[in-house]
Amino acid sequence: IGLGQFCHIVRRNIPIVYIVENNGVYGLTKGQFSATADKGSKLKSGVQNDLQPIDLCGLAIELGCSFVARSFAGDPKQLMALMKAAMSHKGTAVLDVISPCVTFNNHEGSTKSYK
């Protein structure tokens, strides 16, 4: 949701901190795959994701973003330091926060899981 706006914000270097809580699913729609879902992930219904995930950091770099970082929600010390750096950056800052969804995406095969 909002990938088109993401691209335009980055390309125009709008001074904003763009934080993505990246868990690979749309939890409010009962766990549908997001654009960042791991290939091979399965919904509880058994449907498998056959698409490669979009790498938001890679996309931001490709679009010319001058501040790009990735962190993990379970590491608050690192996350806080990155958030402070992003807020002091002049221009677009993209922070991709891997944030596990324990309801719909908590399995050993997920890169966005506690398991």
Give residue spans per PLM region.
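Glycine-rich beta-alpha junction loops
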Residues: 23-25, 75, 98-104
